[in-house]
Design a protein with these regions (language model features):
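Conserved nucleotide- and phosphate/pyrophosphate-binding catalytic cores
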Residues: 69, 87-247
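Divalent-metal (Mg2+/Mn2+/Ca2+)-assisted nucleotide/phosphate chemistry catalytic cores
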Residues: 1-109
Length: 247
């Protein structure tokens, strides 16, 4: 919370624990379930990293999509924001809202960042996840660790399925604007790009070396997360709790 508040001061947090103990929560879970079908719930299991077969092993998994839809109603959310892997839950919430005469939330989905291990950005099985420590970037990673992880990242000489270019297109360029790739003078000196498209073009043409791209990515990422790390480190107790929670 402390890290997030660096960029969003004044934000209010609601945890799942706050919601599930609220009045009428579980009644709404049952109402959403009744407004849907077993087939629809089975399709939505992918939102929790499961496939449709997993539902046959454990009945409780079928409650999760209905709970996620109920969360949206409990928050009185006008907008449901999530990765593309959450679209089944959001569509369930929209469809059930019609049947239950509830306000219909707008669903906004962001692209998934691909695992550094490669490939594919839109494949939920290959998305960046903390369950794969070498394939993901964490908010508490030092600059040295970011550089090490990215140095081993899958970075093919094309755009499709390139997780390093994904990071620039969907995260770094929108946050930083002007793009600077630092290079030693003996290798041509620093490169500056005023748009992601020009960075991509330079990489695909071969004028930007993969290692330079990776090192520049690590430096830019650290520029963004450093203020959050410094804020959290100013409260050692919170920082220790963060590290233990994400291991």
């Amino acid at each position: 919370r402390q890290m997030f508040s660096v960029f969003c001061p004044g934000v209010k947090f609601k945890t799942a624990n706050d919601l599930v103990h609220g009045e009428g929560y579980w009644e709404m879970v049952l109402r959403v379930s009744k407004a849907s079908s077993l087939k629809r719930m089975r399709r939505a299991l992918s939102i929790m990293g499961r496939d449709e077969v997993d539902g046959d092993k454990d009945m409780s998994k079928f409650f999760y999509p209905a709970m996620q839809a109920t969360d949206i109603y409990a928050l009185n959310a006008d907008l449901a924001l999530g990765g593309m892997d959450q679209r089944h839950a959001h569509m369930l919430a929209r469809d059930a809202a019609d049947k239950l005469k509830l306000p219909k939330p707008v669903a906004l989905h962001t692209p998934l960042l691909g695992s550094l291990s490669g490939p594919g950005r839109m494949d939920t099985d290959a998305k960046m996840s903390k369950s794969d420590p070498t394939g993901t970037l964490l908010i508490h990673d030092s600059k040295k660790k970011l550089t090490k992880k990215l140095s081993k990242a899958y970075c093919p000489p094309e755009r499709e399925g390139n997780p390093v270019l994904d990071i620039w297109q969907y995260l770094l360029e929108p946050a930083l604007g002007n793009i600077i790739i630092e290079r030693p003078e003996k290798f041509g000196g620093n490169l500056t790009f005023d748009s992601y498209e020009k960075l991509e073009s330079a990489y695909l043409s071969g004028s930007l070396h993969p290692l330079d791209l990776k090192n520049g990515t690590a430096a830019a990422l650290y520029q963004i997360i450093k203020p959050m790390q410094e804020s959290c480190e100013s409260n050692p107790k919170n920082y220790t709790s963060l590290l233990s929670a994400i291991k």
